[in-house]
């Protein structure tokens, strides 16, 4: 073969690489959706180096922002050894601008709530962060809002009461333009949670309320505790009768579902109890055998 033929052969082999050189890039399994994705569709977290597909991570972040109330967004891997936390720069790159602004606002509100030297003005329309003077733990101090000049207690958020305890204090004194929104009136649109005293606004809907701050469930009209009222019997009698805000049919359907769940759990317990009784001797024997083996292993007289 001449030199021209050898050059043509080398050019052909260079332009047509072997099949091994065209092997596809390795796929990585996402721990959230369990789908295999290429590396360009994955995102690695900076703090813990865990890797997930970008689409799943975006959905996870948006859900964490809506449900997390400003708490840090942790790695979605439940068995992450480094317990990684997502940085703000990562969140800003993966969620829309409005979602990131919501996260920053909720985060700031949470920081103020946990800071003993800052608190929110209890007037709903004010939303001013007020400085709290240092004091002994649990000792109430006078706080004055720099915007609306409301003077209130740092502990119970009621009007400042210098000579009485928080439980015996009078209702909070609000500016005239806000008094129609607050108070003990059953139809008032804004009330305080009976447990944590956070202000809650109700526009419409169900009268069974759950405080987002402390998870306490109560009746909006009389503020009675409903944590253990799974059948909603509170709205069958008394001053709150038929004030739940749902039709009678929906209430009966809810009670039917609760009864069905309880009956199902009872049936499962009845079915599994004989099996547990039959298997209990075997379980006890295995436990005793294991204990004897450990005792012999650590007994110095046997060595």
From Swiss-Prot:
Zn(2+) 5 binds at residues 219, 222, 234, 240. Its EC number is 2.3.2.31. Changing residue 206 to A: No loss in inhibitory effects on TBK1-induced IFN-beta promoter activity. Induction: Transcriptionally by TP53 or TP63. By LPS. GO terms for molecular function: ubiquitin conjugating enzyme binding; ubiquitin protein ligase activity; ubiquitin-protein transferase activity; zinc ion binding. It is found in: Mitochondrion membrane; Cytoplasm. Zn(2+) 2 binds at residues 121, 126, 145, 148. Zn(2+) 1 binds at residues 30, 33, 53, 56. Broadly expressed, with lowest levels in brain and thymus, and highest levels detectable in heart, ovary and testis. A zinc finger (RING-type) spans 30-80, 193-222. The active site is at residue 206. Auto-ubiquitinated. Zn(2+) 3 binds at residues 153, 156, 161, 166. Zn(2+) 4 binds at residues 193, 196, 211, 214. SMART domains: IBR (SM00647), RING (SM00184). GO terms for biological process: apoptotic process; negative regulation of apoptotic process; protein ubiquitination; ubiquitin-dependent protein catabolic process. It is an enzyme of class 2 (transferase). PANTHER family: RBR FAMILY RING FINGER AND IBR DOMAIN-CONTAINING (PTHR11685). E3 ubiquitin-protein ligase which accepts ubiquitin from E2 ubiquitin-conjugating enzymes UBE2L3 and UBE2L6 in the form of a thioester and then directly transfers the ubiquitin to targeted substrates such as LCMT2, thereby promoting their degradation. Induces apoptosis via a p53/TP53-dependent but caspase-independent mechanism. Plays a crucial role in maintaining the genomic stability by controlling the degradation of multiple proteins involved in mitotic progression and DNA damage. Regulates epithelial homeostasis by mediating degradation of CDKN1A and isoform 2 of TP63. Interacts with UBE2L3, UBE2L6 and LCMT2, as well as with BAX. Interacts with TBK1; this interaction inhibits TBK1 phosphorylation and 'Lys-63'-linked polyubiquitination. Belongs to the RBR family. RNF144 subfamily. This is E3 ubiquitin-protein ligase RNF144B. The gene is RNF144B.
